[in-house]
Regions:
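Short, flexible catalytic-loop segment of classical short-chain dehydrogenase/reductase
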Residues: 49-59
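Catalytic tyrosine of NAD(P)H-dependent dehydrogenase/reductases that use a Tyr as the general acid/base
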Residues: 19, 27
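Active-site loop immediately N-terminal to the catalytic Tyr-X3-Lys motif
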Residues: 13-17
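Active-site helix of classical SDR
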Residues: 22
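Conserved catalytic-site region of short-chain dehydrogenase/reductase
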Residues: 9-11
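Residue(s) in the substrate-gating loop at a strand-loop-helix junction
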Residues: 6
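C-terminal helical subdomain
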Residues: 46, 61-98
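Alpha-helical segment proximal to the catalytic Tyr-Lys
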Residues: 35-39
Length: 118
């Protein structure tokens, strides 16, 4: 079972907190489901894409490390083959999000506000 989450699940920003909280909820649900299904032969894979170039995102400011649907698909196929429970697309976004997740809140707020010009 492949569950599409988002890098936003790692930490919400002032301008995406509703979206980020729903993705964090999806991550939590998938984690619990994976535990419940352990030993059943059903794998649960959480995919955390960053900004993806699609028709829906046309006209939005492009985020750093943006990716394409085809690139996300490659990551998903690899995760299925390797049975990896959590993957990032692109893979390079994982260390960035790990760093952002561990920043003190005032620093994170200053960084994201400046980046968003908010």
């Amino acid at each position: 079972l492949v569950v599409l989450s988002s890098v936003a699940a790692e930490r919400s920003r002032f301008d995406n907190y509703v979206y980020a909280s729903t993705k964090a909820g999806v991550d939590s649900w998938a984690s619990g489901l994976a535990d419940a299904l352990k030993g059943s032969g059903i794998d649960v894979i959480v995919v955390r894409p960053g900004f993806v170039h699609t028709k829906m995102t046309t006209g939005l400011p492009v985020a750093p490390l943006a990716t394409t649907p085809d690139q996300v698909a490659v990551v998903i196929v690899e995760a299925i083959k390797t049975r990896k429970p959590l993957v990032w697309a692109p893979k390079t976004v994982r260390p960035l999000m790990s760093t952002l997740r561990h920043l003190p809140r005032p620093v994170f707020q200053a960084v994201t506000k400046k980046a968003g010009n908010g």
